[in-house]
Amino acid sequence: MAGSSLRQVAVFGATGSIGASALDVIARHPERLRASVLSAGSKVEDLLALCAAHQPAHALIADAALYPALRDGLRALGLATQAHAGAEALDALAGSDACDTVVAAIVGAAGLPSTLAAARAGKRLLLANKESLVLAGELLTRTATAAGAEIIPIDSEHSAIFQCLRSCDAGRGVRRVILTASGGPFRGRDRAGLAAVTPAQAVAHPKWSMGPKISVDSATLMNKGLEVIEAHHLFGLPGEQIDVLVHPQSLVHSLVEFVDGSTLAQLGLPDMRTTLAVGLAWPERVESGVGGLDLLSQGRLDFEAPDTAAFPCLRLAWDALRAGGTAPAILNAANEVAVSAFLQGQVGFLAIPALVEHALTTLPRHNADTLDTLLFADAQARQITERALAHHALHA
């Protein structure tokens, strides 16, 4: 976009780890990128600090009760930034001319409405909120196509596939894609060795700096399962053409195998600023702040099959993808409730897949025709999982 006007970027989930990485890249390129909208859930002081640093036109706090604190804080800082609060205002900003690019980094199903609003408005959508695709992948991709919106994935694995496919024939001739997984902090442990895992251990990821929920998903391999479903929607591939390999070094982010026998892979240091720079500047390349990969110093690259017996969440995600309809929404919602309970010390680590499987096997699958249908399935899954927690059922 050399020679064009500033790209106006909305960073939803600005106080999280992905938001911080996005703002780091944006700040490196003031001549081409501007953080025009910043949002946060409830961390109003952190949001005010970001507003002081980046001076956006708009700032939003999702918790409406904190609106006065945001408004008064902006005034005290002498900023012209306009304060907003609540989900409806977030959706309105996503679809407004305040931005042409949206970094969708709100964790969980809460990020879906604003993501859909951005897609409906034809924005460039840098998608870090995997739940949007898992919960409503068909709806989101259909909406984006109809409005001319551009979805660029920010997950390192999907960004790798995106880059490999854009370098050749736009996806034709693909035999399979291979997502890589670090294996998380508990790689190599059996189920007995996972029973006593603590939340503090689960959020200590060996390679990536991530929020607590995503870190636990990585530890259970649910993160990789959700990425399998994402890849299905992003690249139009059936589950049979999507494989997973554990790669503990986290340097090869994904591979694409073509029908002619050739394979393309994307490599790089594990830093989200790389994929955000790809999304913000595509099809150009800009400095991200991440150094190059020195293969001589890195040494060996190892690959192994995932252990779905010890980590059944990956298998459950494939099951949900095959079932289709509302099954992925049920999977995602039950997982959110189970992970939250684990982080609060209510259940053990092995209860997470047990609770998810309980929801998948108990609730009926319906066609995912509308957002209302998907949100109803989401609510049902949360309810049945919370009921299981309340009755102390399935605690592992």
Swiss-Prot record:
Q: In which pathway does it act?
A: Isoprenoid biosynthesis; isopentenyl diphosphate biosynthesis via DXP pathway; isopentenyl diphosphate from 1-deoxy-D-xylulose 5-phosphate: step 1/6
Q: Which domain of life is it from?
A: Bacteria
Q: Does the keyword Manganese apply?
A: yes
Q: Indicate which residues the UniProt annotation says bind 1-deoxy-D-xylulose 5-phosphate.
A: 130, 156-157, 182, 205, 218, 223-224, 227
Report the enzyme's class at the first EC level: oxidoreductase
Give the matching Pfam families: DXP_redisom_C, DXP_reductoisom, DXPR_C
Q: Which residues bind Mn(2+)?
A: 155, 157, 227
Gene3D superfamilies hit by this protein: 1.10.1740.10, NAD(P)-binding Rossmann-like Domain
Query: What's the catalysed reaction?
Result: 2-C-methyl-D-erythritol 4-phosphate + NADP(+) = 1-deoxy-D-xylulose 5-phosphate + NADPH + H(+)
Q: Is Cell inner membrane there in the keyword field?
A: no
Its keywords, alphabetically, are:
Isoprene biosynthesis, Manganese, Metal-binding, NADP, Oxidoreductase
Query: Sorted alphabetically, which SUPFAM superfamilies does this protein's record hold?
Result: 1-deoxy-D-xylulose-5-phosphate reductoisomerase, C-terminal domain (SSF69055), Glyceraldehyde-3-phosphate dehydrogenase-like, C-terminal domain (SSF55347), NAD(P)-binding Rossmann-fold domains (SSF51735)
> Where is NADPH annotated to bind?
15-18, 41, 129, 131, 211
Record-listed E.C. numbers: 1.1.1.267
Q: Which cofactor does it need?
A: Mg(2+); Mn(2+)
State the Gene Ontology BP annotations.
isopentenyl diphosphate biosynthetic process, methylerythritol 4-phosphate pathway involved in terpenoid biosynthetic process
**What GO molecular-function term can you cite, just one?**
NADPH binding
Function summary? Catalyzes the NADPH-dependent rearrangement and reduction of 1-deoxy-D-xylulose-5-phosphate (DXP) to 2-C-methyl-D-erythritol 4-phosphate (MEP).
NCBIfam families documented for this protein? Dxr (TIGR00243), PRK12464.1 (NF009114)
Question: What family does this belong to?
Answer: Belongs to the DXR family.
Q: What is this protein called?
A: 1-deoxy-D-xylulose 5-phosphate reductoisomerase
What is this organism's lineage?
Answer: Bacteria, Pseudomonadati, Pseudomonadota, Gammaproteobacteria, Lysobacterales
